[in-house]
Amino acid sequence: MAQQGDGNSEPTEVAAEYLMTIRYMHGEGQPVIAARLAERLGVSAATVSEMVTRLGREGLLSVEPESRQLNMTEAGRTAAERTFRRHALSEWLLTEVIGLGWADADEEAHHLQHALSDRVTDRIDELLGRPPTCPHGNPIPRDGQTPERPVGRALSEAAAGSDVTILRVTEEAEEDARLLTFLQENGVRPGHVFEVVDVATHIGTMTLRRVASGAHGGHEVTIGLVAAAKLRILEGRADQALFHRVPERARLAATG
């Protein structure tokens, strides 16, 4: 275990990535076994086995004897939630204050999340207005509590002719840099409203039209149903109070 400057014991960067991935998989309702974890991380089964043993020794992970499912201990969940909070706040800082794109910000946040102390993380949180979610709409845990959010349903299930509000981009979608860039460039982000123009199941796509005033209104985007299944929506035009907007003071702080 590594030591942070504020005196808190932290898992190493690699260990934190394992815990974060397990957290994501549990959040998707997937039973986590070593083989699935290796596939998700793109590493060998032997590498995962070695890390699982290490995390078990450090009291962060347990393995069910019969099913071989991997479960985080309370200490493991705490470590994963702390890392995710730092990652999410870093993404807000990088996208809304510094101006990076979603994909670049996600990559940079993986570096920042291991460098921030709790003190600095708390100050960033305050500067950003304590966002309840990451920029992609996934809830940020604080003090062991995760804010209640609507569950929503997959965009791929929406019917032609309906209006939908983007609720969140799942962690699975966040792992695809090209998809993140595509979504950002086309305004498919939490809080934005679209009309489902067409669902072409025979070719596996759906077409959306942005519902907004000004230049952004009427923009059409065609997205694959496989990608749409990784997005969550609310039916109709949802209350915009659900969606965080970074305070102007944060942007002013960046420009001096």
Where are these regions (language model features)?
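Short, hydrophobic-biased segments on the C-terminal half of alpha helices
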Residues: 52-53
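Extreme N-terminal segment that seeds HTH/winged-HTH DNA-binding domains in transcriptional regulators
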Residues: 1-42
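Basic, amphipathic "hinge/linker" alpha-helix immediately C-terminal to the N-terminal HTH DNA-binding motif
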Residues: 67-87
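Glycine- and charge-enriched low-complexity intrinsically disordered segments
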Residues: 217-256
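A short, conserved structural fragment
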Residues: 56-65
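Mid-protein regulatory/catalytic core that forms ligand/cofactor-binding pockets
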Residues: 113-228
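Key DNA-contact positions within bacterial/archaeal DNA-binding proteins
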Residues: 46, 103
